[in-house]
């Protein structure tokens, strides 16, 4: 970044500081990952200069013959990965992908069945502080009080009672496999559409290590980062019968020109997801998550649902007599990055919370394996149990530094 360094020292310094943070800390935020240098190169390419309103072959600007090729590559690769009939790779985010689906099939005030945010759902699944909860009549389903797993009988009962036009499956903090086939059966029974938000698990689905929602859902939305390990962005997969409507909902419905440099980066990431080593990577994510969950439980920590089936673990910190906010802060102080998170049947404020959400996608990309998961479990427990002991926290910092120094990040940057 020689040009940036010469031209804008302040921005360069901030970027260098962030690179230093990523190199020196253990990244456990479940929604984050480390992209390849090829993905970064595509996103930083001259495609950032090109306006391309519309779709390949039907643009409102000239000079789109090369970006058309890039977008077609991205769409074709997604179809190959997930078996989708139609794909739109233009959404700038997962939230905008969800918005486009809602705009396609719903009218203001329509009833939708979605997962309670504190039970693992997402803001765009009907939270009252989000457009989805303002524009539509969302009815919430959640998890069982004992098992902390989705209660499908309750979902069916609420679907029969409220007759939603759309049912939303998928989550941002649910560590278990979701039965998409069961959701489709429920949707069919009440005459509803089914949308699956697979943002967190898309990479695991791509590798064939998690059930694929595409055969069961009318619409599937996802981000392109997280376990899929691409640039920050979104996309929509749908049945061919909804293709024109979905495309119109994205453009000109809620977006203008697509970010062609980001779509190029998406295409590169999708190409990576088609390689054999991506399946190995995804399997390592799951193996690491299971090992980390086991280690945390051996240390006496409480896990929501008792473990994990995917990349995500939700820790209930109440038995440590601290809050999620305190846990996030003290872990960050020693070099472990997590996020505070609500837990099912939460009683604390969402700014305080009773839980911490962690994930293994980023550390797996970095090369961490089972032995490192044992050390991370020990570090998390040691830090939280000694959160007011500065000598113990200093010891934890040294252990984090010793661990991260073994796995250099982005050596060419």
Curated annotation (Swiss-Prot):
GO MF term set: glycine hydroxymethyltransferase activity; pyridoxal phosphate binding
The protein's enzyme class: transferase
Name of this protein: Serine hydroxymethyltransferase
Superkingdom of source: Bacteria
Recorded name of the encoding gene: glyA
Organism: Bacillus cereus (strain AH187)
Family: Belongs to the SHMT family.
Residue numbers bearing the N6-(pyridoxal phosphate)lysine modification: 226
Keyword Ligase on entry: no
InterPro entries noted in UniProt: PyrdxlP-dep_Trfase, PyrdxlP-dep_Trfase_major, PyrdxlP-dep_Trfase_small, Ser_HO-MeTrfase, Ser_HO-MeTrfase-like, Ser_HO-MeTrfase_PLP_BS, SHMT-like_dom
E.C. designation(s): 2.1.2.1
Cellular component terms per the entry's GO annotation: cytosol
Residue positions binding (6S)-5,6,7,8-tetrahydrofolate: 117, 121-123, 239, 349-351
Cofactor section: pyridoxal 5'-phosphate
Functional note: Catalyzes the reversible interconversion of serine and glycine with tetrahydrofolate (THF) serving as the one-carbon carrier. This reaction serves as the major source of one-carbon groups required for the biosynthesis of purines, thymidylate, methionine, and other important biomolecules. Also exhibits THF-independent aldolase activity toward beta-hydroxyamino acids, producing glycine and aldehydes, via a retro-aldol mechanism.
């Amino acid at each position: 970044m020689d040009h940036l360094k010469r031209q804008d020292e302040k921005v360069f310094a901030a970027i260098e500081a962030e690179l230093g943070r990523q190199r020196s800390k253990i990244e456990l935020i479940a929604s984050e990952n480390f992209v390849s240098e090829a993905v970064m190169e595509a996103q930083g390419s001259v495609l950032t200069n090109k306006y391309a309103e519309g779709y390949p072959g039907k643009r409102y600007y000239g000079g789109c013959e090369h970006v058309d090729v890039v977008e077609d590559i991205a769409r074709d690769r997604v179809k190959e990965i997930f078996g989708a009939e139609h794909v739109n790779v233009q959404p700038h985010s997962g939230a905008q992908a969800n918005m486009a689906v809602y705009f396609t099939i719903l009218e203001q005030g329509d009833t939708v069945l979605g997962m309670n945010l504190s039970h693992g759902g997402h803001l765009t699944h009907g939270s009252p502080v989000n457009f989805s909860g303002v524009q539509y009549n969302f009815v919430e389903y959640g998890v069982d009080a004992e098992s902390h797993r989705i209660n499908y009988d309750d979902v069916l009962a609420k679907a029969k009672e409220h007759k939603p036009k759309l049912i939303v499956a998928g989550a941002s903090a649910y560590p278990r496999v979701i039965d998409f086939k069961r959701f489709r059966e429920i949707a069919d029974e009440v005459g509803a559409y089914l949308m699956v938000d697979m943002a967190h698990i898309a990479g695991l689905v791509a590798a064939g290590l998690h059930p694929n929602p595409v055969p069961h859902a009318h619409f599937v939305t996802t981000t392109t980062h997280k376990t899929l390990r691409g640039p920050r962005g979104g996309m929509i997969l749908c049945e061919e019968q909804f293709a024109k409507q979905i495309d119109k909902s994205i453009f000109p419905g809620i977006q203008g020109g697509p970010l062609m440099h980001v779509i190029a980066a998406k295409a590169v990431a999708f190409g990576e997801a088609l390689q054999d080593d991506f399946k190995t990577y995804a399997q390592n994510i799951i193996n690491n998550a299971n090992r980390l969950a086991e280690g945390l439980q051996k240390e006496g920590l409480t896990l929501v649902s008792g473990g994990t089936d995917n990349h995500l673990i939700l820790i209930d910190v109440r038995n440590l007599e601290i809050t999620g906010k305190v846990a996030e802060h003290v872990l960050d102080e020693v070099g472990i990055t997590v996020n505070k998170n609500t837990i099912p049947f939460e009683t604390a404020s969402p700014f305080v919370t009773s839980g911490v959400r962690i994930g293994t996608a980023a550390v797996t990309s970095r090369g961490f394996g089972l032995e490192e998961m044992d050390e991370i479990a020990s570090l998390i427990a040691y830090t939280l149990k000694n959160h007011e002991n500065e000598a113990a926290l200093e010891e934890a910092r040294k252990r984090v530094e010793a661990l991260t120094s073994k796995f250099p990040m982005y050596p060419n940057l």
